[in-house]
Amino acid sequence: MNISSVCIQNFRKLYQCHIDFSNDTTLFVGANNSGKTSAMDALGKFLAGRPFAFNDITISNRELINQIGKQWETVACEKPNSLSEWGNLLPSLDVWLNVNPQDIHYVVGIIPTLKWRGGRLGVRLIYQPRKIEGLFTEYREAFFSARETEKAGAAEKKIRLFPNSLCEYLERYFTSSFVVKSYILDPEKFDADSPQETAFGMECLVDNPLTGIIRIDTIGAQRNLSDPEKHDG
């Protein structure tokens, strides 16, 4: 069994990045600011449980998230019951494995159908709202409370209170409002250039079914060991 490829979406500058893995060693090579570090950070955060930050959301998606917030700020807005609006905005990692029949016992939690007999298997890990209904309610309570307080103090001094937008709210409550969830992918729909839509109804029974299968170790850069421009002092 080995990792055949990964696809990183909506993570920092990596809007959609497909990476093929070799059977032995895979090296990321590229110019500065080309996304090498972002790719490695995505692997560490999704597969090793390292903490996310609001800045991990692709900048171009933040205005779209604020547009969702604008809808939520209307009094008559109905509580959402799905993540359909968020599907193309959230950081995600697709992991595609090549699994031999003798290794099936390692991946029983992500086998898509009883007809599967080996070969490609895929899992999508998404950093998503823990409960979209709860985020909706909590944001509206904070937003409307801030606006009421502003009105009450408007006669004395014009003030602007937190939160003014959904992104501003998430910057403060990101890790408490979001969590990694995993979804089984359909091997027959694999396309390196066009990732399949998330089937939110196919959530795995465990948050990370790849725990125990994939291990992430990081060796920090030892710049001073070989830097010819090293200076003392």
Language-model segment annotations:
Residues 1-49, 57-69, 81:
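Pre-Walker A-like glycine/lysine-rich segment at the N-terminus of P-loop NTPase domains
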Residues 58, 62-90, 96-233:
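Glycine-rich phosphate-binding loops of NTPases
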Residues 44-52, 130, 224:
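Non-catalytic alpha-helical coupling and interface elements of nucleotide-dependent molecular machines
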